[in-house]
Amino acid sequence: MSAARRPGSVLVLARSGRMRDGHLAVVSRVVSSREIRVDHANWASGSLKGRIMRDQPVLDVSPRNDWSVVKVWYPPSGAYGVTAYPAAGFVHPRSQWAAR
């Protein structure tokens, strides 16, 4: 895993109190050193649960700007959520396939 974020990489949120299985989101774009946008599902509740949310903001709130703690946009409130989530890092797709 890496702290480097780029479009196509997968943000991995670690298991925590209310999020017993963790969460994955695909980076759609990098906005700044502290903000990315992601595509993900099952973040909201109620009628939005299960829907794929596209280009949703995620904010790095870690003290060292290392993407170890993030806040995620919560569509029903139209704002970042109150909870800060531990992030395990980013998984990057392979850019090349090994020759056979």
Q: What name fits each language-model region?
A:
Residues 1-45:
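...with weaker cross-activation on analogous glycine-rich loops/strands in unrelated enzymes
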Residues 32-100:
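Aromatic- and glycine-rich peptidoglycan recognition patches
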